[in-house]
Amino acid sequence: MLKIAICDDDAGDRERIAEDLRVYAAAHQEHSIEMTVYSSAFAMLDAFEKAGCPDIALLDICMPGMLGTELARDILRCSENTDILFLTTSSDYAVDAFALHAADYIQKPYTQEKLSASLDRVIALRQERTWLLLPCEGELHRIALEDVLYIETDGKRRSFSLASGRKLTARLTAAQLQDCLAGRRGMI
């Protein structure tokens, strides 16, 4: 199941993006796409607090109350595993978007082919990632191995420092940690 969220304050744009995503999902049923649509950044953030962040977020940038780049920053604070694609009429925020490691920056009006090509690329990259499941604070956290900067050890406590600045702590034995990282390039 691939969770994709759309956030755009313009009803016409929101419906167009949703329809284009439905067309994409119908042509790529192997991805089993679940779509949610939001009309404001605040509605999207409220939903994420309850249900967790999506795998991919399609965000407008110029929205009342909160820019899409600010929304992306908030999303990435709670989930560094969410890929962000910006769909916007403005070219003014491209540098900010890529500073957030946006997967793409698509200017409106766009074509179905452009959105599909971008989604194909992002989904292919997601499938190539190596994922770790870490038991932290009573929950399982799924993190991309490439996001782990370093691991600190204190007894059975392992603190994983992530590229986002977040730190996750898991209780793992040395053997469990070794199993978790076995065969992963760059890890000792």
Where are these regions (language model features)?
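Conserved SAM-binding loop
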Residues: 6, 37, 86-87
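Short, well-ordered amphipathic alpha-helices
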Residues: 15-25, 44-45, 72
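Conserved binding/recognition cores within well-folded domains
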Residues: 117-188
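A generic structural motif
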Residues: 25-35, 81-82
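Conserved acidic segment of CheY-like receiver
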Residues: 2-22, 57
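CheY-like receiver
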Residues: 43-128
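Conserved Asp/Asn-Gly motif in the active-site loop of CheY-like receiver
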Residues: 35-43
